[in-house]
Curated annotation (Swiss-Prot):
PANTHER family: UPF0166 PROTEIN TM_0021 (PTHR35983:SF1). Belongs to the UPF0166 family. This is UPF0166 protein SCO7045. InterPro entries: N-reg_PII-like_a/b, N-reg_PII/ATP_PRibTrfase_C, UPF0166.
């Protein structure tokens, strides 16, 4: 199990829920590549409302179309490992927003096998 404490870097990739990579959801491809690269972890968060570079507001509110909602893929690991992963995103993320933020890991514990 990867041990991670102290200073870290948070990578957040904002894309649309309908964005794809070879007929697979883009957010899923990013998670699987992060896993294959051995990063500490990745999570996908679905937004309920938002807009991006297109300036089109997407929402889940009743009586509104809930198409292509915003999705954030968040990865936290050491700065070296996260920065090493960035070139893998270049071919995947052609539209969207990619941000990096320093953070501090207070606890990182996985489930213990039964």
């Amino acid at each position: 199990m990867t041990r991670l404490t102290g200073s870290a870097l948070r990578l957040t990739v904002y894309v649309g829920e309908n964005d794809t990579w070879h007929h697979r959801p883009l957010y899923s491809e990013i998670v699987h590549r992060a896993h294959a690269a051995g990063l500490a972890g990745a999570s996908v968060f679905r937004g309920v409302e938002g807009f991006g570079a297109s300036s089109i507001v997407h929402t889940t509110r009743l009586l509104s179309l809930s198409e292509d909602l915003p999705v954030a893929v968040v990865v936290v690991d050491t700065e070296e490992r996260v920065r090493g992963f960035l070139p893998l995103l270049d071919e995947l993320v052609t539209e969207g927003l990619v941000t990096l933020d320093p953070c501090e890991v207070v606890r990182y514990e996985g489930r213990r096998p039964s």
